[in-house]
């Protein structure tokens, strides 16, 4: 896959994501225990209007909402995210297709070392804050 096609697929994914609704479980607004944890659960009731995909009911996830396969799961910049805990893990990355995300358990001193080494290797760090 060439660079132009890759960028085109990233744009297609961004356009699809803008239109994608939030998929929430059936009647999530009705019970407080669902409001605090609004994640998808498939409707399974025999009389469920949402399962029958009736007009006016919330949308259900289906394969048509997914991103193009070649760019699925990538960072919006087009890089594959890799979680980094130390400098040794950073050196295994491919700077052309992978970007580093420093783990939240890493302290300030080691974070500075990782950022310096990433700059030397030409690796993009997705969360460079100090």
From Swiss-Prot:
Annotated SUPFAM superfamilies: Ribosomal protein L32e
Pfam families for this protein: Ribosomal_L32e (PF01655)
Keyword Nucleotide-binding: no
Keyword vocabulary terms for this entry: Ribonucleoprotein, Ribosomal protein
One GO CC term on file: cytosolic large ribosomal subunit
GO molecular function: structural constituent of ribosome
GO biological process: translation
Cross-referenced SMART domains: Ribosomal_L32e (SM01393)
Family: Belongs to the eukaryotic ribosomal protein eL32 family.
Name this polypeptide is given: Large ribosomal subunit protein eL32
Annotated organism of origin: Pyrococcus horikoshii (strain ATCC 700860 / DSM 12428 / JCM 9974 / NBRC 100139 / OT-3)
Encoding gene (name): rpl32e
């Amino acid at each position: 896959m060439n660079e132009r096609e890759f960028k085109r697929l990233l744009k297609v994914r961004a356009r699809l994501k803008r239109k994608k609704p939030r998929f929430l479980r059936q009647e999530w607004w009705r019970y407080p225990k669902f409001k605090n944890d609004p994640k998808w659960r498939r409707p399974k009731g025999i009389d469920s209007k949402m399962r029958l995909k009736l007009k006016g009911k919330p949308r259900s996830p289906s394969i048509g909402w997914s991103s193009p396969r070649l760019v699925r799961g990538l960072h919006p910049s087009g890089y594959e995210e890799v979680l980094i805990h130390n400098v040794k893990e950073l050196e295994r990355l491919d700077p052309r297709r992978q970007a580093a995300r420093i783990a939240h358990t890493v302290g300030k001193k080691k974070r500075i070392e990782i950022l310096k080494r990433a700059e030397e290797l030409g690796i993009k760090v997705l969360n460079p804050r100090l």
